[in-house]
Every structure is written in C-alpha cells, then in structure tokens.
Design a protein with these regions (language model features):
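A sensor for short, sequence-defined functional sites
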Residues: 1-4, 8-388
Length: 388
C-alpha cells in the first residue's frame, strides 16, 4: 500500500500512522521561497529532503513500512512513538500564540465581568471566588468538543458564550479567564503541548488542550479539564505570551476510610471470610484489573498517584483473626504496594497503600508496574480469614 500526501498550509499537525500497515508514504510541504518554515518529523528516523524549483521550496519525507497503529489499551496520550509531522509558517511559536492571544482579547465582554462580580460579591476569600466561578461554568455551561482548527481559531464574544450556555474549549477557557480577572483573581490562558514537541517550531494546530492559571493568595493554581500537575512532565505548558511555565509535578492523593462488620452468621464450618470492599476512586476506577501479561508498546498511567485506604473491621464476639499480621511490602524502583494489619482492641485496622511515581513505562518495565497494579486490584489481597 502506498500513500502520498501534499500539504499546503501554514499550520500542520498530522499523525502518519493508520489502523493498517502502510508500505510507503510520501509527505511533502510546499511553500514559496523566502517563506519561513519550521517543521519536524517525530517518532521516525527519516530525514527531510529539501528541494527548490520555480520559486517553490519543497520539503518531503518518504516513510516506508509503517506498522499499523497499536490497539493496546493505555497507550501514551501524546503517542510519542508514532510518526508525527508538525510544521508551521509562523515566524515562531511565540508569534503563533500571539495571534490567538489577540483574538481572545478581542472577545472580552462587559456582561460576563459584571456577572462574575455579582456571583462573588459575598465571597469571603479568593479561593471561594475561584470555586464559585469554576463551579458555575462547570455546572451551567456545556462544552462543544470542536477542535480549534475546525473553527478557524475564532472566538465568539464571551457575553454570547455566557448567555448561550455553551462554548468550545477555547471559549470556555477564555470565559473562565475573564470572569476570574473580573473577580480580582489574576488569571491567564495557557496552551498545553505534547512534551516531546519543539514548541518554538509549532503553530496553533499542535496545541493539545488549554488551561487557565489563576493566582490565588499568592499561589498559582491550574484549572483545566484534567489536572496538569499529575502528568509527570509529559506535557509542555506555555503562556500566550510565549513564556514556558514550569509546573511542579504532584501525584493524585487519595485517602479514604471504610468500616466493615462481620457477623457470626457469615461463618461456615467454623470459619468466616471477610472481603474488604474496593473504593470507587483511584486505581480501582482505571479499569486495569485484567492487564495483558506482555506488551509491545509504551504503557501510560492516567496519572501519578498515592492512594491509602484504611479499613476498620469489627468481627463478631469470639472470632479470631487467622490471616497473618506481618506487614507486606512489594517495592519497585518507581513505586510500592503495602499492607498492614493491626489488632486494636475489639477491632482490626487494615491499611493498604500504593504509590506510583512514574507515569510512562517501556515494554521492559511493564511487567514490574503490572505486578504492582495487580497486587492492588486483585480481590484476593483484600481477604481476611477468621475462625469462630
């Protein structure tokens, strides 16, 4: 199978992998001579060939034997290993962002500003103002998931967005930004790019998502559809003025408690089995209870995470714990799983913890991370045995 593609545009973000193998794929970009062109092919060792003729500069790549895209679950969000072409005729990434910044500034509205002041008029502090505005937008506006490129990077007047109760991700981000600033919270819109791209060579098409940075009581908060701080440095965050933003990586923190009672009626033949319930958040919500034993591509977790669940078990009178109370620890270079069982008077305290401090794993590392996840999700590891 052969595929040839010629793109004449000023802003390209194209993945060059299909669901079936490609024998040969030729990609070419043509621009008038003298036009600035920044381009890069990622996920492939193929080098660019540049030619000029009749006042036209052409840059092309010929890729051969591209494998079919993987159907494995939990692939990297940025697909770093897939052939990926990025090109732009903007003078720089900063210049591209400046065009977007200009359009956002033209979309400011009076009604949305006064409405933000009305909503937060009785708020006691800055954090409360942020929560009120964020919750209003989340609960009362719908997001139309239309890529920015398909709208021509246009932004409706923000007052129109507020009145219509819907908007594109770009419009929703700008509405949040405008309302926060109107409430006295210094804020700005940020662009988020895949971390492996050279953002200075990117146009607007390579933007993965948008976020809003709000300075609350002197500390920066990042408001986005998914937490930016849990990605482990896999993304690059840039302000619309072109300044790179360094975001401290912090794992998701989950700490929950459960109470479990065991009655004598549950015993059979002198023994009772107690299965501690899984929680509905964290790793148990990721759908990883049945991972393949082997993997040929990168494996990516939804986020870094630290999770702790404490169970207080109250057995019936006369029941004795038969499960070993020895601490269990399974440790790997990037995380660990622990379990402690401690009798406390008439109750038994069970504490399970898991830490995953890395988000992306090679096929060689996959077995280790799979063993930690399996240790956590396997219901057999949440069983206590009692005798009566």
């Amino acid at each position: 199978r052969q595929r040839q593609m010629c793109i004449r545009d000023r802003d390209i973000n194209e993945r060059l992998q299909e669901t079936s193998p490609v024998k040969e794929c030729k990609v070419s970009i043509s621009v008038p001579e003298g036009t600035p062109l920044a381009c890069g092919l990622y996920g492939s060792p193929v080098k660019a060939v540049e030619e000029s003729h009749d006042g036209i500069k052409e840059v092309h790549w010929t890729l051969r034997n591209i494998p079919a895209s993987s159907r494995e679950a939990f692939q990297p969000k940025n697909r770093e290993a897939s052939p990926h072409l990025v090109a732009s005729t903007y003078p720089s990434g900063k210049a591209a962002l400046a065009t977007l910044d200009k359009r956002l500034k033209e979309s400011q509205g009076y009604e949305s500003k006064t409405f933000a002041q009305f909503l937060t008029d009785k708020s006691g502090n800055e954090q409360e103002k942020v929560n009120i505005i964020r919750d209003h937008i989340l609960n009362n506006l719908s997001t139309c998931p239309i890529p920015m490129a398909m709208t021509g990077y246009t932004v409706r007047d923000i007052d129109t967005v507020l009145r219509s109760a819907y908007g594109t991700p770009l419009e929703i981000a700008q509405l949040l930004n405008v309302m926060l600033n109107a409430a006295g919270i210094p804020s700005e819109v940020l662009a988020v790019y895949p971390g492996h791209l050279d953002t200075d060579a990117c146009g607007l098409a390579a933007i993965q998502t948008l976020a809003v940075k709000a300075t609350v009581d002197g500390k920066d908060q990042y408001l986005s559809a998914s937490p930016l701080t849990n990605r482990g440095g896999l993304d690059k965050v840039v302000s619309l003025s072109g300044t790179s933003i360094e975001i401290e990586t912090t794992p998701i923190q989950i700490k929950e408690s459960r109470s479990v009672a065991i009655s004598a009626d549950q015993a059979k033949d002198g023994f009772a089995i107690c299965v501690l319930p899984a929680i509905s958040a964290g790793i148990d919500s990721w759908g990883m209870s049945a991972l393949n034993s082997k993997r040929s591509n990168l494996f990516e977790l939804p986020s870094l995470i630290r999770e702790e669940v404490t169970y207080t078990v109250t057995p019936a009178e006369g029941m004795k714990l038969q499960t070993s109370t020895q601490e269990q620890v399974i440790s790997k270079p990037f995380g660990k799983v622990t379990r402690t069982i401690t009798p406390r008077g008439n109750t038994i305290e069970v504490v399970r913890t898991i830490e995953l401090n890395k988000q992306q794993f090679t096929p060689a590392e996959y077995s280790d991370v799979r063993s930690l996840i399996h240790e956590w999700t396997n219901p057999d590891n949440r069983v206590l045995l009692f005798s009566l």
